[in-house]
Swiss-Prot record:
GO terms for molecular function: ATP binding; glutaminyl-tRNA synthase (glutamine-hydrolyzing) activity. It is found in: Mitochondrion. PROSITE patterns: AMIDASES. The keyword Hydrolase does not apply. Its main location: mitochondrion. GO terms for cellular component: glutamyl-tRNA(Gln) amidotransferase complex; mitochondrion. Allows the formation of correctly charged Gln-tRNA(Gln) through the transamidation of misacylated Glu-tRNA(Gln) in the mitochondria. The reaction takes place in the presence of glutamine and ATP through an activated gamma-phospho-Glu-tRNA(Gln). InterPro entries: Amidase, Amidase_CS, Amidase_dom, AS_sf, GatA. This is Glutamyl-tRNA(Gln) amidotransferase subunit A, mitochondrial. Keywords: ATP-binding, Ligase, Mitochondrion, Nucleotide-binding, Protein biosynthesis. Subunit of the heterotrimeric GatCAB amidotransferase (AdT) complex, composed of A, B and C subunits. Pfam families: Amidase.
Length: 510
C-alpha cells in the first residue's frame, strides 16, 4: 500500500526542493516565527526509508537530543534532552529529517499560540495568498508553530500534540491537514506532559497522503509508554476498519461514497459559530451528499458539557505535572539575594515558579489545584470525570463500529444500519482571529471557547482529522481565510478516518 505512496511523495518533495530553497524556508520562518530552532542538513540524506527526504519539524514539547526543548517556557529555556522521544526516533529510523523545533503555547496550554517566550506565531496564509500585509492573524494553538511551518512550506510535515484541539485548531486556521490519533496509538514517551489522560502526538501536513504516511510510521506499540495500546487491541480495531473499507471499496473505486453513513452531531453548532463557517460546512456536506454519502443527524447530548469538564480535568492534571518544576529537581532556579531564603524551600519554589511560569500556566495550575482540594473534589473533579464517561457513551451509542477497548457485544446488522461510520463537524467556530484582537481580549474565556468543537473527541480519546473545507462557491474578491472540517471516528479507526478524509480532499479539488 505504501510503496507507491512513498515514491510519489519522494518525487514531489524533490520537485518542491528545486523551487523552495533552504534560504526561502528560512525567510518564511522569520516572517511567521514558526520554528524556534532551524537547521537543514548539509547534504541530502541517502534513501533509506519510507520517509526519506521528508523534512519534519517537531513541536517544542517533544524532546530531541540535538535541539533544545523549551516548551516555550522560561523554566526550561536551557534544557537539552540526552535522548530522543520515541516518535522522533521512529521518524529518524524511517529516513525523515528533523529540521527544527516548532513554536507552541507554553507547555501546550493555549489555543492561539500567543503564550510563548518566543513570541506569537503568525499565520502564513496571507504570505502565500496575497503577499505580506498588516492583517496578521493567529496560527492557532497550541501547535501553531507546527501548522505554520507546514503551511509556509518550511517543512513537509510536522509533529504536534493535541490535548483538547491543539492540532486540529491550527490546521483549520492555516488551511492544512491535522490528525489527532486515537489515544494510545502513538507513543507519548519523551513528550513533556500537560494532561496525561488527554495528550496525543499527531501529524500536520499539506495533504492526507503525507499525514497518513507519517502516522503509519509512528503509530506502533511502545513498552516505554504505559498508556500505549496493546498490539492485540490495535489488531482488533484495524480488522474492523479494514472490513468496513472493504465493504465500501467498490463504490470508492468508482469515485462514490454510496453506503457511507456520516453523522452530523446537532450539538456542534453553538451560538458562537460564525455564519461564514456554517455556510462553508454546509457546502462540504452537500458535496458529500452529491457523492452518494448518507447524511444522518445524530445527538450527543452530554457533549454540551464537554468544555467545562475538559478545563477542570486538564487543569487538574496540569497542576500535578507542573509541580516538578520547582528550581530544585527540574527547571531554572531564580537566584536569591538573601542567603537565608535558601533555607526555606517554599521560598525557592515560589520565587522560581512565579518568575518562570507564564500567566496562562499559572492560571491553569491555580484552577487545577482548586479542583483537587477536598472542598471542590466531588463537585468539580469527580463530576467532570462523570461527564467524560457520559461523553464516551454518547459516541459509542452512535457509531456502527464497536469500541474494542471495552468488553461489549457487537452491534447486530439491524442496529449497525441505524448508526454511522464517522461524524462530521466544523473544526473551529471561526476562521483565524487577528492577533491584535487576541491581545486585547477582555478575558481568557474568549480563548477557551475556541476549543468548544474539538474537546469532545479528546475527552473520548477518538481519532479526529481536520481537513480544509472546499473553496466557497460564492464569487468574492476578498481573501477567504481557511476553514476546516473534522472527521471523527470510533477508537482505533484512524485508517478509516484517513480514507474518508482522502476522498473528501479529492472531491473538493475537482
Amino acid at each position: 500500500m505504501h510503496g507507491g505512496l512513498t515514491k510519489a511523495l519522494r518525487s514531489s518533495r524533490l520537485a518542491r526542493r528545486s523551487v523552495h530553497s533552504h534560504a526561502l524556508a528560512a525567510e518564511a520562518n522569520r516572517a511567521t516565527n514558526a520554528l524556534v530552532s532551524l537547521k537543514f542538513p548539509d547534504s541530502p540524506p541517502a534513501e533509506k526509508g519510507p520517509l526519506s527526504g521528508l523534512r519534519i519539524a517537531v513541536k517544542d514539547n517533544i524532546v530531541t537530543r540535538d535541539f533544545p526543548t523549551t516548551c516555550s517556557s522560561n523554566v526550561l529555556k536551557n534544557f537539552v534532552s540526552p535522548f530522543d522521544a520515541t516518535v522522533v526516533h521512529r521518524i529518524r529510523e524511517n529516513g525523515g529529517q528533523i529540521i527544527g523545533k516548532a513554536n507552541c503555547d507554553e507547555f501546550g496550554m493555549g489555543s492561539l499560540n500567543t503564550y510563548t517566550i518566543h513570541g506569537p506565531v503568525i499565520n502564513p496564509f496571507p504570505l502565500s495568498k496575497v503577499g505580506l500585509n498588516n492583517d496578521k492573524r493567529s496560527a492557532g494553538g497550541s501547535s501553531g508553530g507546527s501548522a505554520a511551518a507546514v503551511a509556509a512550506d518550511i517543512c513537509d510535515a510536522a509533529l504536534g500534540t493535541d490535548t483538547g484541539g491543539s492540532i486540529r485548531l491550527p490546521a483549520s486556521y492555516c488551511g492544512i491537514v491535522g490528525l489527532k490519533p486515537s489515544y494510545g496509538l502513538v507513543s507519548r514517551w519523551g513528550v513533556v506532559s500537560y494532561a496525561d489522560s488527554l495528550d496525543c502526538v499527531g501529524v500536520l501536513a499539506r495533504d492526507v497522503e503525507t499525514t497518513s504516511c507519517v502516522f503509519e510510521r509512528i503509530s506502533e506499540y511502545d513498552p516505554n509508554d504505559p498508556t500505549s495500546a496493546l498490539p492485540e487491541t490495535r489488531e482488533k480495531a484495524d480488522a474492523l476498519s479494514s472490513q468496513r473499507l472493504d465493504e465500501l471499496s467498490s463504490a470508492l473505486a468508482e469515485g462514490s461514497l454510496h453506503g457511507l453513513r456520516i453523522g452530523i452531531p446537532q450539538e456542534f453548532f453553538p451560538s458562537e459559530l460564525s455564519n461564514h463557517v456554517l455556510n462553508r460546512f454546509r457546502q462540504s456536506v452537500q458535496l458529500l451528499k452529491e457523492r452518494g454519502a448518507q447524511i444522518i443527524p445524530v445527538s450527543l447530548p452530554s457533549t454540551s458539557y464537554s468544555l467545562s469538564a475538559y478545563y477542570v480535568l486538564a487543569s487538574a492534571e496540569a497542576s500535578s505535572n507542573m509541580a516538578r518544576y520547582d528550581g530544585i529537581q527540574y527547571g531554572e532556579r531564580i537566584p536569591t539575594q538573601d542567603p537565608s531564603d535558601l533555607k526555606k524551600v517554599s521560598t525557592v519554589y515560589a520565587r522560581t515558579r512565579s518568575s518562570t511560569f507564564g500567566p496562562e500556566v499559572q492560571r491553569r495550575i491555580l484552577l487545577g489545584t482548586y479542583a483537587l482540594t477536598a472542598d471542590a473534589f466531588d463537585n468539580y473533579f469527580l463530576q467532570a470525570q462523570r461527564v467524560r464517561q457520559l461523553i464516551k457513551d454518547d459516541f459509542d451509542r452512535v457509531f456502527a463500529m464497536p469500541n474494542v477497548r471495552y468488553a461489549q457485544p457487537s452491534n447486530t446488522p439491524a442496529q449497525a444500519s441505524q448508526k454511522v461510520d464517522v461524524l462530521l463537524h466544523p473544526s473551529a467556530i471561526r476562521s483565524a482571529p487577528r492577533l491584535d484582537e487576541v491581545e486585547t481580549a477582555a478575558s481568557s474565556l474568549d480563548a477557551y471557547v475556541q476549543d468548544v468543537l474539538t474537546v469532545p473527541a479528546s475527552l473520548a480519546g477518538l481519532p479526529a482529522l481536520s481537513i480544509p473545507c472546499p473553496p466557497s462557491s460564492s464569487e468574492t474578491e476578498e481573501v477567504e481565510w481557511p476553514i476546516g472540517v473534522s472527521i471523527v471516528g470510533q477508537w482505533g479507526s484512524d485508517h478509516f478516518v484517513l480514507a474518508v478524509g482522502k476522498f473528501l480532499e479529492s472531491a473538493a479539488s475537482v
